[in-house]
């Protein structure tokens, strides 16, 4: 079975672990009766968070997925590498280099150095990610939504001079923790970008497509902002199953509720499902899973409530199984 997941952030990476647990891929292959040829997992990953930091190209969501599936992620933070040190960052602070609010670990720097060198040599991000994955062996194809620049920027009221300005998502998210007056999101470069060939192929070839319970605005929404992705979803022959990132009007993690309020969407499972919309109309969903106790009615979408707490890969695998069952796909 070929599974393609739209994913971003720590939640997206943990969801991918659950898919691997169910299918016996990656870290779970040794205990599985399935062969690698039986199943294939592809992830179309958000690149809206990508930024130039200290002259290096940083791709947080791609790296979080790569480290998580490769067994090297910091388990406490859910991002970055385990056993990380911060000597380079401390020295940069002593030099007074900005930004001082975005931390790059010493181990993590190696990833960004390789990526930046390959970008400067003319390689597209898709090929670079594949090369980086040779080191981590994540057991999945990690596919940037686009090889082009398509960055999420945020229009805020500056807390110092009260002017309205646009800042990079990372500054809004990491420096300000989304605690400044926020007016809108913009996907800079989207009009000149196109979906990566590998991402489109993964959607077309899938037996089932899943929307991870990632932030619907700045993760899944940023992927959908890439020209060609939404059309590929609507044209796909595979059923599309979405997972609510909202449980009892609160996000599973992160600040999805803050992002939703900016675009005028309530922080409920039903509202997020309607935001995505039914594929039989103008949206992208065939099925929508909400947490036990939540309720949603969405015209044209089959809805079911199941436990959606990703407490460990086994619990997440049961979420994935429930999505397959709802879509009529045998895992």
UniProtKB/Swiss-Prot annotation:
Positions contributing to 7,8-didemethyl-8-hydroxy-5-deazariboflavin binding: 63
Cofactor: Mg(2+)
This protein's name: Phosphoenolpyruvate transferase
EC numbers: 2.7.8.28
GO biological process, one term: F420-0 metabolic process
NCBIfam families: F420_cofD
Family under the similarity heading: Belongs to the CofD family.
InterPro entries: CofD, CofD-like_dom_sf, FbiA/CofD
UniProt xrefs under PANTHER family: 2-PHOSPHO-L-LACTATE TRANSFERASE
GO MF terms held by the record: LPPG:FO 2-phospho-L-lactate transferase activity; magnesium ion binding
């Amino acid at each position: 079975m070929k599974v393609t997941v739209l994913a971003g952030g720590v939640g997206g990476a943990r969801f991918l672990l659950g898919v691997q647990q169910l299918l016996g891929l990656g870290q779970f292959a040794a205990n599985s009766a399935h062969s690698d040829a039986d199943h294939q997992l592809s992830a179309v990953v958000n690149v809206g968070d990508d930024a130039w930091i200290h002259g290096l190209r940083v791709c947080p969501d791609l790296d979080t997925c790569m480290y998580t599936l490769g067994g090297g992620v910091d388990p406490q933070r859910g991002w970055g590498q385990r056993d990380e040190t911060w000597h380079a960052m401390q020295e940069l602070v002593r030099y007074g280099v900005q930004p001082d609010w975005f931390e790059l670990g010493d181990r993590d720097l190696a990833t960004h150095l390789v990526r930046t060198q390959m970008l400067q040599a003319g390689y597209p991000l898709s090929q670079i990610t594949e090369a980086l994955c040779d080191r981590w062996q994540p057991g999945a194809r990690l596919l940037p939504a686009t090889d082009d620049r398509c960055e999420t920027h945020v229009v805020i009221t500056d807390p110092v001079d009260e002017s309205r300005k646009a800042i990079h998502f990372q500054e809004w998210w990491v420096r300000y923790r989304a605690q400044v007056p926020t007016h809108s999101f913009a996907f800079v470069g989207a009009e000149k970008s196109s979906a990566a060939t590998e991402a489109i192929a993964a959607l077309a070839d899938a037996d089932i497509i899943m929307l991870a319970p990632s932030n619907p605005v700045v993760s899944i929404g940023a992927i959908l902002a890439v020209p060609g992705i939404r059309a590929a979803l609507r044209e796909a022959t595979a059923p599309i199953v979405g997972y609510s990132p909202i449980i009892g009007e609160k996000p599973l993690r992160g600040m999805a509720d803050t992002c939703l309020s900016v675009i005028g969407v309530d922080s409920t499972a039903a509202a997020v499902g309607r935001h995505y919309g039914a594929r039989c109309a103008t949206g992208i969903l065939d099925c929508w899973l909400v947490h036990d106790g939540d309720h949603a009615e969405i015209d044209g979408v089959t809805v079911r409530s199941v436990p959606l707490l990703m407490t460990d890969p086994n619990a997440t695998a049961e979420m994935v199984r429930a999505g397959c069952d709802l879509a009529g796909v045998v895992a």
